[in-house]
């Protein structure tokens, strides 16, 4: 599974990129607005920090303007994935931009039917929102299973399942078990994947025993 971080915080992105485990970044206008900086400047800076896909979202709602915005975003860097909403205009935009060689992330997916349409439109990524479905008492993870099964039925479909709206480490684990190709995760949740109380307890014990020996490696 690939790990993307869902943030526009440059410091957080640099810290996670330094681990060598970060495969990409997803952003949206809300995340970038929190930085108080120019949208295009932030996106360009992120593209310079990570080599993998950086999702940057259009803000228009009609296909002609989405396409124009998408082309402008794609010029920022080769690793831009233009993010478009799962609407008919978004699907039209996806078809055009992917035809021009631009990566496209189709976002706000809440059904398997939507995911099938996105794949037909040539989407590089489809972003089903797990947490938001859970919020309305639907099974967000079941959607990942459904999309995986449909895509596997048609090997010609190359769209990657990008699990989004992830709230917890269990969401990440369950998405991996369901066959998601990518999980985009908030920084705190991503860092928390390495945490376990027994790991901490074991490390404390090892260090206490080592200290008693009076030895050093360096």
Curated annotation (Swiss-Prot):
Belongs to the transaldolase family. Type 3B subfamily. Pathway: Carbohydrate degradation; pentose phosphate pathway; D-glyceraldehyde 3-phosphate and beta-D-fructose 6-phosphate from D-ribose 5-phosphate and D-xylulose 5-phosphate (non-oxidative stage): step 2/3. Transaldolase is important for the balance of metabolites in the pentose-phosphate pathway. It catalyses: D-sedoheptulose 7-phosphate + D-glyceraldehyde 3-phosphate = D-erythrose 4-phosphate + beta-D-fructose 6-phosphate. SUPFAM superfamilies: Aldolase. The active site is at residue 83. Keywords: Cytoplasm, Pentose shunt, Schiff base, Transferase. It is found in: Cytoplasm. InterPro entries: Aldolase_TIM (IPR013785), TAL/FSA (IPR001585), Transaldolase_3B (IPR022999), Transaldolase_3B/F6P_aldolase (IPR004731), Transaldolase_AS (IPR018225), TSA/FSA_arc/bac (IPR033919). One of its GO terms (biological process) is pentose-phosphate shunt. Its main location: cytoplasm. This is Probable transaldolase. It comes from the Bacteria. GO terms for molecular function: aldehyde-lyase activity; transaldolase activity. GO terms for cellular component: cytoplasm. Its EC number is 2.2.1.2. PROSITE patterns: TRANSALDOLASE_1.
């Amino acid at each position: 599974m690939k790990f993307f971080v869902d943030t526009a915080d440059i410091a957080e992105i640099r810290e996670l990129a330094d681990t060598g485990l970060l495969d990409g970044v997803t952003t949206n206008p809300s995340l970038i607005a929190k930085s108080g900086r120019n949208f295009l400047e932030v996106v360009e800076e992120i593209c310079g920090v990570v080599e993998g896909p950086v999702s940057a979202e259009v803000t228009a709602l009609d296909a002609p303007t989405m396409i124009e915005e998408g082309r402008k975003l794609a010029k920022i860097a080769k690793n831009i994935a233009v993010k478009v909403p799962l609407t008919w205009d978004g699907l039209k935009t996806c078809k055009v931009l992917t035809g021009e060689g631009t990566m496209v992330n189709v976002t706000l997916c809440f059904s398997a039917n939507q995911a099938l349409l996105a794949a037909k439109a040539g989407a590089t990524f489809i972003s089903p929102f797990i947490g938001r479905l859970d919020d309305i008492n639907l099974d967000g993870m079941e959607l990942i299973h459904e999309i995986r099964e449909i895509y596997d039925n048609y090997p010609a479909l190359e769209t990657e399942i990008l699990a989004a709206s992830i709230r917890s480490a269990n969401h990440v684990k369950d998405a991996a078990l369901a066959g998601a190709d990518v999980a985009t995760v908030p920084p705190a949740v991503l860092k928390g994947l390495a945490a376990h109380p027994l790991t901490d307890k074991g490390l404390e014990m090892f260090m206490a025993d080592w200290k008693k020996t009076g030895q050093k490696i360096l």
